[in-house]
Amino acid sequence: MPLKQNNDFTWIKRKKHSFFRRRNLILLITGIIIIGILTLISSAVSGFVRSKGYSNTWDFVETVISNYFSGTKASPETISLQIENKEYKKLEKNRQQALDRGVIVNDMDGEFVPATLEYKGKKMSIKLRLKGHMTDHLQEDKWSFRIKMSGANRFMGMKRFSIQHPGTRGYLAEWIYHELMKREGIIALRYKFIEVTVNGRNWGIYAVEENFENELLENNNRIKSPILRFNPDLYWINRLNELKDVNSFDEYATYYSANPEAYREEEGLKDSTWKANYLKAIALMESLRSRKISVSQAFDIDKLSKFHALIDLVGGEHSIDWSDIKYYFDPIKNKLEPVAY
């Protein structure tokens, strides 16, 4: 009997040691995994922090906290949009169509509807539509709008402008971009931040971005003359076809297939001086595209050089994509110059 008890004790002791060995092994493996995960997270956070220009994580956290509390003291200007229910439902329908499709197509989703904009106690008639191409412009309760003022009304000196989630333009980065361009004599858009309410609901802080009108030229001390681009409609139709898995020829949606055109072309062509400048500008764009003339023959090379240098500085490569870039025709030098956008 004592022998059996001794054997039982030895078996229990062996099992106990085996359990602790397994437990220690599991704890060791778990610890290694946790340390590995924390190392990866730390590395990712450090990489993100460095990409934002901070030397270490603490500087980043300290700045974010400081900026947050500074932001609570801000008192941005406010506008109020009133959209009748019938018109609001049209916007909702267009928004849902674009979300289902995966891209905003202006011919399908760009219907302007009447509304009222109130600013500093003054109510002004406007027309607005959904704005943008990518669906980040259609976030819940943060839709982007293109707005055009009616008659002689102006908002902050602008006849046409957009309001959009600041994140669609990199928050403060876009404001800095335009300020730098303006300082170097490049045509720059008015770009501000405001608080927006829609039908009595606060939709938060929006970025206001000027559109391409004569007021833009006046604000940049330029003579009235065409602002031009290469029409990107075929490019976006091609993007839509790709989303639908429809085969199409990419060459029909490239820079070489896009028609050069001017903003407010129909209105401008009624003015003989504007029309003459328009024809000169189109000829320059076509000659440059077909490589019949050099870049320096088509552009104010000093302004173009500064434009590209600043784009490199701020990482704004999207501004030189052919579907985004805009040009102004200088009627004195008979050359094109870039418009910051």
Task: Give the label of every model feature segment.
Residues 2-341:
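Phosphate/dinucleotide-binding and metal-coordinating scaffold of catalytic cores
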